Structures are given as C-alpha cells and as structure tokens.
C-alpha cells in the first residue's frame, strides 16, 4: 500500500455509512441540499478517506462543556461489508466465498477498518481467511504454471473471478515465481 497505489486509492473511495454528531453549516450538498446545513444525526455514506478524517477530528460543543475529549464530527456505522453474516460466511468456509462480489478491495478495507477501531476479532478472522485462501491461491497458481490443460485453465479462470485485488496480486506473484523456479531448475 502506498501513496501511488491505485488499489489503495480505489479502496479509499469506497463509501461507508456514518452519522453526523453536530449540525454542520454549508455541507448540505453532501445530502443533495446545497446551501443548507447537515443536521445532527443525519446519516450519509461518505468516502473512507473523508469519513476517516471526520471520525478522528473532534469539535468543541457548546452543549456540554464538561466533556474533556471533543466528540468527533461523525460516528462511523458498521458497513454491510463487515456484517455478522459476512463474518460468519468467512468463518464457515473462506475458500468458497466470492470475495470480489463483496468488495474488490476487501482486504484493504478490512485492514483499514480493523486499524481504525482496533478490532481484534476482525483481525483474527482476516488472518485465518488469508491463511485458508492463500493455500488455495497457491494451489491454483502452481497448477496453472505446471499444467496447460484447458479444463484446468477454465477452473482457474472461475476461481480468479472470486479473488479480491490483493489476492490477485498474490496469485500473479506466485505464478510468476513458480515459472521462474521451473526455468532455474531446467538450467541447473
């Protein structure tokens, strides 16, 4: 992940649900009401890069001056991406899950979410899923480079459509490294 990584940029553009904790003047255009304020408790979906900043930065409220730590501008709401049904599906069989249909940047978003909220359960689920799916990715990448059977290639094409962008990178790297290893063994 880096500043110029296109997958990271696309992941940061993913919209997440949030609720405003304050009336904010002049931001009504986010709701489709230009020139009007966003009212307190208004629910919107905003890009992750914006929500992250608004969820971390707080504002001084005139309502309760005794509060030591200012309340952030927005409260992030749990997205469907990390709903209990999705996490249960991952736990029950990560290899059979079509991760790309859930989100093309699932791992990147999950990593950012787990970091933002220090979500240990999500981190553990991600770790277990990556280990389980990583073995399957490795098996497919090696079998494609070892065998050029048409039926094998069709199975791998279907499998590749279920991978998110991070997993596709792992697949490509594994496939290239396996081919390079075969070349090296032939030369030796």
Swiss-Prot record:
GO terms for biological process: mitotic DNA replication initiation. Disulfide bonds: none annotated. InterPro entries: GINS_A, GINS_bundle-like_dom_sf, GINS_Psf3, GINS_Psf3_sf, PSF3_N. CDD domains: GINS_A_psf3, GINS_B_Psf3. It is found in: Nucleus. Keywords: DNA replication, Nucleus. One of its GO terms (cellular component) is GINS complex. PANTHER family: DNA REPLICATION COMPLEX GINS PROTEIN PSF3. Component of the GINS complex which is a heterotetramer of SLD5, PSF1, PSF2 and PSF3. Belongs to the GINS3/PSF3 family. The GINS complex plays an essential role in the initiation of DNA replication. This is DNA replication complex GINS protein PSF3. It comes from Kluyveromyces lactis (strain ATCC 8585 / CBS 2359 / DSM 70799 / NBRC 1267 / NRRL Y-1140 / WM37).
